[in-house]
UniProtKB/Swiss-Prot annotation:
CC terms in the record's Gene Ontology section: extracellular region
Name under which the protein is recorded: Bowman-Birk type proteinase inhibitor
UniProt keywords, alphabetically: Disulfide bond, Protease inhibitor, Serine protease inhibitor
Function: Inhibits trypsin but not chymotrypsin. Inhibits the trypsin-like proteinase activity present in larvae of the crop pests Adoxophyes orana, Hyphantria cunea, Lobesia botrana and Ostrinia nubilalis.
Keyword Translocase tagged: no
Keyword Disulfide bond found: yes
Species per Swiss-Prot/TrEMBL record: Medicago scutellata (Snail medic)
Record-annotated disulphide pairs: C8-C61, C9-C24, C12-C57, C14-C22, C31-C38, C35-C50, C40-C48
SUPFAM superfamilies linked to this entry: Bowman-Birk inhibitor, BBI (SSF57247)
Marked site (Reactive bond for trypsin) residue numbers: R16, S17, R42, S43
InterPro entries: Bowman-Birk_prot_inh, Prot_inh_BBI
Quaternary structure and interacting proteins, as annotated: Forms a monomer at protein concentrations of below 1 mM. At concentrations of above 2 mM, self-associates.
């Protein structure tokens, strides 16, 4: 598994529009470094998800 310093995503659904709208739906202890809109739960360990919408998917983390 890659670290969160490298932007990566295992689950990234995209719309069929042109350009596509993609969103990483991975839930991790923190968001990857390229994430601009990261929301985390207050649980321990935290569960974080990046809510950015891009026109591409990052490489797989695993």
């Amino acid at each position: 598994t890659k670290s969160t310093t490298t932007a990566c995503c295992d689950f990234c659904p995209c719309t069929r529009s042109i350009p596509p709208q993609c969103q990483c739906t991975d839930v991790r202890e923190k968001c990857h470094s390229a994430c601009k809109s990261c929301l985390c739960t207050r649980s321990f360990p935290p569960q974080c998800r990046c809510y950015d919408i891009t026109d591409f998917c990052y490489p797989s983390c695993s």
